[in-house]
């Protein structure tokens, strides 16, 4: 089983999706889907913001490490940070992106990055497709994928998980993923017809 792991980085709702590659992308199938939720607790814990960020990264890393160990992906696909962000948002995106790259490096898994609008363009055909449209695309393509999420998943969890699934699906269509796909078994035909009478 060849798996592509898609990651949609965020400090608040970090989505991940494991996509099993088929002989063609029409035969790809999600086998794992989830989202890690974390929240700021620096004030409540009376700790520095940097230490609280570290705690949140640890929580995310624990889940991602477990996913890599379980699914043993052959390729990790990450959505690149994009858009104008204020300082805190930019820092959060940078931390989550760095965590994704480090995860791939530590497990020696090839890693590629896709731009934020690329899944929308490749899968839906419009760069400005909404998160709801992307989720609808996933559910139309894989009707049972919602069952991979935990019961009563919140809207942010669904968005993070399905964003990660579209990232994985986009990466699965890349030139890098092509050689990883299982090959169709060749049909060996007999050089003689067993129904014909033997000669000699």
Predicted regions and their residues:
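Phosphate- and other anionic-substrate recognition elements at nucleic-acid/protein interfaces
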Residues: 1-200
